[in-house]
C-alpha cells in the first residue's frame, strides 16, 4: 500500500499485487466487430463528411442520441495504438516490485502506474463503491516529463497523445460549429479556450481475466459513471471470446453494449461540455461489465482513454438556452453535487473535489 498526497489531500493506493503474462497484440488476429454491429444509439461518423450546415445539424442530432459516438476514417495509423498497448503489456509483465517504482498519485500530473484494483470512482454506481478491476498507466503528454520505464514506451505514448490531441481538437471544433446550427446566437469563439493540448492526458488500461474474490462485492469491472472531461476519446480492442464489456446506459436505464470497431475512436461527451452547454449535450453514462461466470476465459480487454479537460475558467454559455425538453437533467451530476451553478467555476475546483474522493 502506498500513501501519498495530491493537492494536499491524502490518498491511498490499496492495489492488489498480481503477476501478469500478457501476450503481444496483433491487430489482424483480433476479433473486431464490423460497423454494421453498432446499435442505432452509437453512430459511426466520418468528420471529413461533416462540413455543410445540413451535415453539421445532422451531426448534432447524432451525438445527442446517447452522448457517445465513433469517429472513423480519422487518419491515425493503427500501429500507434497497437504499439502503445504492447509497450504497456510488456511493462505489466515485469514483477510488481519493478512496476511499483512508477506508482504515484501524481500520475494525473506527470504520468504513472496504478496497480490492479488501485482506484475506485467516487460517486459512480449510485455511490455504491467498489474497486476498479483494471491496471492502468497514465500519460500526460510531451508537454511534461512523464514517468516512463523506457524510451520506446515514451515514444509510443507521446505519439499517441499528439495524434489523439489533434483529433480531439477537430472533434471539439466540429461540435462548436454544430451548436451554432441550433443556437444561432452562439459563436464558437465563446468556448475556444477549451481547445488546449495541455488539457489532455490519457490512460493505458488492461482489464484482466479476473473475477471478484470470494465474498467480494463487485458488480462491474468499472462502475457506471460520467467523465468529468470536456470530451473523452477511447480506443478499445476486443476480448478474444467476443465479450463486449463496455456499455452505456440510456436515459430509461437500458444497457447497450459497445462493440469494438477496428482503428476507430469512441467519443464520450463529458460533464464539462454538458455543463458549458447548459445540459443540452448529454454526458455519456458508461461502465465496464464482468462476463458471466462461464465466460471469463478470453474476456481480457484493453483500452486507451484520452481525457480532454475543459479550460480552467468555466462559465456556461449565455447563448445556449435549450428548451426544457432538450435538457438532460442528470448529465453533469458531479458538478451539481459539488455546488456548481450557472455563475461559473474553475475546473481546478471540480477536479480537486473529484480527487478528494477518488481513491480507496
UniProtKB/Swiss-Prot annotation:
<comment type="pathway">
    <text>Secondary metabolite biosynthesis.</text>
</comment>
<dbReference type="GO" id="GO:0046872">
    <property type="term" value="F:metal ion binding"/>
</dbReference>
<dbReference type="Pfam" id="PF03171">
    <property type="entry name" value="2OG-FeII_Oxy"/>
</dbReference>
<dbReference type="InterPro" id="IPR050231">
    <property type="entry name" value="Iron_ascorbate_oxido_reductase"/>
</dbReference>
<dbReference type="InterPro" id="IPR026992">
    <property type="entry name" value="DIOX_N"/>
</dbReference>
<dbReference type="GO" id="GO:0051213">
    <property type="term" value="F:dioxygenase activity"/>
</dbReference>
<keyword id="KW-0408">Iron</keyword>
<dbReference type="InterPro" id="IPR027443">
    <property type="entry name" value="IPNS-like_sf"/>
</dbReference>
<dbReference type="Pfam" id="PF14226">
    <property type="entry name" value="DIOX_N"/>
</dbReference>
<feature type="binding site">
    <location>
        <position position="225"/>
    </location>
    <ligand>
        <name>Fe cation</name>
    </ligand>
</feature>
<feature type="binding site">
    <location>
        <position position="227"/>
    </location>
    <ligand>
        <name>Fe cation</name>
    </ligand>
</feature>
<feature type="domain" description="Fe2OG dioxygenase">
    <location>
        <begin position="200"/>
        <end position="310"/>
    </location>
</feature>
<protein>
    <recommendedName>
        <fullName>Alpha-ketoglutarate dependent kainoid synthase</fullName>
        <ecNumber>1.14.11.-</ecNumber>
    </recommendedName>
</protein>
<feature type="binding site">
    <location>
        <position position="301"/>
    </location>
    <ligand>
        <name>2-oxoglutarate</name>
    </ligand>
</feature>
<comment type="function">
    <text>Iron/ascorbate-dependent oxidoreductase: part of the gene cluster that mediates the biosynthesis of kainic acid (KA) and derivatives, natural products with neurochemical activity acting as ionotropic glutamate receptor (iGluR) agonists, thus being neurotoxins. Catalyzes the conversion of prekainic acid to kainic acid and kainic acid lactone.</text>
</comment>
<keyword id="KW-0223">Dioxygenase</keyword>
<feature type="binding site">
    <location>
        <position position="286"/>
    </location>
    <ligand>
        <name>Fe cation</name>
    </ligand>
</feature>
<dbReference type="InterPro" id="IPR005123">
    <property type="entry name" value="Oxoglu/Fe-dep_dioxygenase_dom"/>
</dbReference>
<keyword id="KW-0479">Metal-binding</keyword>
<comment type="similarity">
    <text>Belongs to the iron/ascorbate-dependent oxidoreductase family.</text>
</comment>
<keyword id="KW-0560">Oxidoreductase</keyword>
<dbReference type="InterPro" id="IPR044861">
    <property type="entry name" value="IPNS-like_FE2OG_OXY"/>
</dbReference>
Amino acid at each position: 500500500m502506498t500513501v501519498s498526497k495530491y493537492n494536499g489531500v491524502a490518498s491511498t493506493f490499496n492495489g492488489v499485487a498480481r503477476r501478469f503474462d500478457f501476450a503481444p497484440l496483433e491487430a489482424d488476429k483480433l476479433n473486431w466487430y464490423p460497423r454494421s454491429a453498432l446499435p442505432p444509439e452509437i453512430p459511426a461518423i466520418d468528420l471529413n463528411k461533416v462540413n455543410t450546415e445540413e451535415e453539421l445539424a445532422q451531426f448534432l442530432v447524432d451525438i445527442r442520441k446517447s452522448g457517445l459516438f465513433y469517429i472513423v476514417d480519422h487518419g491515425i495509423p493503427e500501429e500507434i495504438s497497437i504499439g502503445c498497448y504492447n509497450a504497456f503489456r510488456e511493462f505489466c509483465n515485469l514483477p510488481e516490485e519493478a512496476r511499483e517504482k512508477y506508482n504515484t498519485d501524481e500520475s494525473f500530473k506527470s504520468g504513472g502506474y496504478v496497480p490492479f484494483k488501485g482506484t475506485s470512482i467516487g460517486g459512480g454506481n449510485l455511490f455504491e463503491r467498489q474497486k476498479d478491476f483494471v491496471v492502468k498507466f497514465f500519460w500526460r503528454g510531451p508537454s511534461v516529463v512523464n514517468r516512463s520505464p523506457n524510451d520506446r514506451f515514451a515514444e509510443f505514448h507521446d505519439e499517441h497523445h499528439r495524434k489523439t490531441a489533434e483529433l480531439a481538437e477537430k472533434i471539439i471544433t466540429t461540435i462548436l460549429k454544430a451548436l451554432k446550427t441550433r443556437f444561432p446566437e452562439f459563436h464558437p469563439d465563446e468556448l475556444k479556450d477549451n481547445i488546449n493540448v495541455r488539457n489532455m492526458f490519457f490512460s493505458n488500461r488492461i482489464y484482466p481475466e479476473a473475477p471478484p474474490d470470494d465474498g467480494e462485492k463487485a458488480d462491474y469491472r468499472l462502475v457506471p459513471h460520467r467523465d468529468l472531461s470536456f470530451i473523452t476519446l477511447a480506443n478499445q480492442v476486443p476480448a478474444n471470446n467476443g465479450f463486449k464489456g463496455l456499455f452505456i446506459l440510456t436515459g430509461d436505464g437500458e444497457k447497450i453494449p459497445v462493440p469494438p470497431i477496428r482503428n476507430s475512436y469512441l467519443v464520450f461527451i463529458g460533464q464539462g461540455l454538458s455543463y458549458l452547454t447548459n445540459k443540452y449535450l448529454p454526458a455519456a453514462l458508461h461502465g465496464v461489465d464482468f462476463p458471466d461466470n462461464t465466460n471469463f476465459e478470453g474476456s481480457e480487454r484493453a483500452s486507451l482513454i484520452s481525457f480532454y479537460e475543459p479550460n480552467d475558467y468555466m462559465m456556461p454559455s449565455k447563448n445556449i438556452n435549450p428548451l426544457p425538453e432538450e435538457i438532460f437533467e442528470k448529465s453533469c451530476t458531479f458538478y451539481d453535487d459539488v455546488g456548481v451553478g450557472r455563475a461559473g467555476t474553475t475546473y481546478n475546483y471540480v477536479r480537486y473535489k473529484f480527487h478528494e474522493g477518488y481513491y480507496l
